[in-house]
Amino acid sequence: SAIPAKDAAGYFRLPVDRAFSMRGFGTVVTGTLAAGSVARDGQVELQPSGRLLRVRGVQVHGQPAERAIAGQRTALNLADIEASELSRGMVLTEPGRFRPARSFDCRLQLLPSARPLRHGAPVHFHAGTAEVEAEVRLFPPARMLRPGAEAFVRILLREEQMLWPRQRFILRQFSPVITIAGGEILEANGRRYRRGESPDARLSVLGSGDWSAVLKLLVREAPLGLSLADLIARTGLTPQELAIASGSTKLRWLADGEWLTDPDQMEALRRKLLQAVSDFHSAQPLQPGLGKADAKAAIAPGAPAFFFDELIATSPELIADGTVIRRRGRQVVLQQPEEDASERIEAAFRQAGLAVPTVPEVLGASGIDAGRARAVLQILLRSGRLVRVTDTLIFHAAAIDRLKATIETRRGQSLDVAGFKEMSGISRKYAIPLLEYFDRLKITKRTGDRRIVI
């Protein structure tokens, strides 16, 4: 029969029904390819362990082939694993696309011939080639499901299994071992519901087949949106199918289709960020802006860098300035006490030349408290009037420029520490840090105990 294009184009999944060792070949697994395709020399992921394996060879219906596609009876010759490490019920998948689960929410149909199914009932779960013990959890207030009834149910598995959305399964009772129910997986590792909250409306959307509605639900439940990998794992759709489903919504893709967001949630985050930056400007008038790292931790913890950058870039009132965020047009304006302190601090370093005092000494003589003095110092550093050479050594820019000009007159020549001290008239205390500073600027290059002036 014809293979549905959707299955053949999807992500590779092969439930293992047999694994054995063949002389001259090594480890072989067989099964019916459930979705996607697999090629010789490709890489696959063994679920639920997550182990990556290489495909040495492919057979389709007993004949060697370069590739197998969905619906075909397939045998794979695998490298780097023993047959004893594989068993029926495991699944080979496309690497990085699926995650195993210990529970799932589903739409369950109890057979009319079955006994009433009680909350907490032990059952056998069967899906693909997997069989595992499980427990039925009915959502409150239900305590029992009557024969022939249909309901949304949570199934807890004794062992992790590879599950995917829309996967069909059956349940069998423990004794006698007969089929009692069947269903469709809606969500693996389902969310926790609050006391008194009914999952019916949410699970109805997940099981509706309306993928636009499903995407809106999932993305709006996530404060920052969801990655493409998360969406694939939670819906079973390909990137192309996700793009089509999102096309009829207001949802927006970021990072070239790697992240899906809700514009309304983005706008709410922009408002929070604007308020945080405004509050920071009011509380710290001498600081240029709120640190990006601090803002991200407060507003969007866990967000990828591109998400936060997009948040700033699309805010008409904010701008990223190096490592800080500030309001557009906002400038630090010094009051008279800070202006006087700025002049004292700059004069102290300018007059010192290359024999600079310690930073605490200069700040202590600034005429303002230590906190404001440090803020004024940062303003002078950002303006380029002062230059930080190390954490504890700061020089006036004019002194550094004069020294740089002197060094550059020796371009192509070598220079040792003693020669540098003699040339600059400074002690070793300042000479070593300054030479390392010029190394970083690529004005000099260290070779052993000497420097070459580049």
Language-model features and meaning:
Residues 446-447:
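C-terminal accessory extensions/subdomains outside the catalytic/core fold
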Residues 80-388, 396-443, 452-453:
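C-terminal effector modules of nucleic-acid-centric enzymes and ribosome-associated factors
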Residues 1-114:
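Conserved catalytic-core segments of large NTP-driven translation/proteostasis enzymes
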